[in-house]
């Protein structure tokens, strides 16, 4: 006997209901999975001398872990001030350990995460087409050198090192009228790249990747530029932030940092 019209209708309705229910359930399940797997993003406040190295590190870290890294590059002193004012930051990578120590005294970092990750060097940088031949820092007092850029020593560790080096060779006072101050070391280099100054005293990490000419400033002319990092207290992603901090000082990060001219913990600096 053939099934009745009513039986067929009920069967069709039952199948349709199952299909509708299946369609409703799967998006919910997918949405839940997406929510659970939502990508974590870390906000890293880092000194401007790290811009090239850390962008490469961040790309590799995201590829290996799936954690996105967003960088805020700037002057170490200004970044520290932002953190003091409550900026939502997960990790602070400073160009001087002094600023990390300052945040620690205020209870703003996780003390066990404070670590040195590099020692910086400064260089004398000129454009490749510059007629000037700058071989040593004393050359900056020559009359043909009209404008010199350094990072602002009021809040930039590389600017402090530049000032110390200039004072060590007794030309600091003589070049005051030539000085142009950059807000951070990246802006300082930009002044020279664009021809707004003749010479810039900038981080080796930036000089090595540029197209200009540069010479190292002897490290004995200034205090060591010991760079440190720390996880910020109150981070919402402590586990991932700790992992990125370890990544910088680990076997994945050290070769990248070394490539950009940083002296790493446990290694000796080039004279």
Label every model-predicted segment.
Residues 2-15:
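Bacterial N-terminal signal peptides that target proteins for export
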Residues 6, 19, 64-66:
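Intrinsically disordered/low-complexity terminal segments and short unstructured peptides
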Residues 14-26:
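Bacterial N-terminal signal peptides
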Residues 28-66, 70-73, 77-87, 94-97, ...:
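Exported/periplasmic ABC-transporter solute-binding proteins
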Residues 5-7, 23-27, 31:
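Compositionally biased, low-complexity segments
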């Amino acid at each position: 006997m053939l099934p009745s019209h009513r039986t067929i209708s009920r069967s069709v309705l039952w199948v349709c209901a199952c299909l509708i229910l299946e369609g409703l359930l799967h998006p919910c399940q997918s949405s839940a999975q997406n929510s659970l797997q939502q990508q974590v993003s870390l906000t890293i406040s880092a000194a401007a001398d790290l811009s090239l190295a850390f962008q490469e590190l961040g790309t590799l870290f995201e590829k290996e872990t799936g954690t996105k890294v967003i960088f805020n590059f700037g002057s170490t002193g200004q970044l520290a001030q932002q953190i003091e004012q409550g900026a939502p930051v997960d990790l602070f990578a400073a160009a001087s350990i002094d600023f990390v120590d300052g945040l620690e005294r205020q209870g703003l970092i996780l003390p066990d995460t404070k670590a040195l990750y590099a020692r910086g060097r400064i260089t004398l940088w000129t454009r490749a087409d510059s007629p000037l031949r700058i071989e040593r820092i004393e050359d900056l007092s020559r009359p043909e050198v009209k404008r010199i850029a350094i990072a602002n020593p009021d809040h930039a560790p590389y600017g402090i090192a530049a000032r110390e080096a200039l004072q060590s060779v007794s030309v600091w006072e003589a070049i005051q009228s030539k000085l142009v101050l950059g807000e951070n070391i990246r802006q300082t280099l930009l002044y020279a790249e664009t021809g707004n100054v003749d010479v810039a005293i900038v981080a080796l990490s930036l000089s090595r990747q540029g197209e200009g000419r540069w010479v190292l400033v002897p490290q004995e002319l200034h205090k060591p530029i010991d760079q440190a990092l720390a996880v910020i207290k109150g981070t919402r992603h402590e586990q991932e932030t700790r992992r990125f901090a370890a990544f910088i000082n680990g076997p994945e990060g050290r070769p990248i940092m070394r490539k950009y001219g940083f002296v790493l913990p446990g290694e000796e600096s080039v004279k």
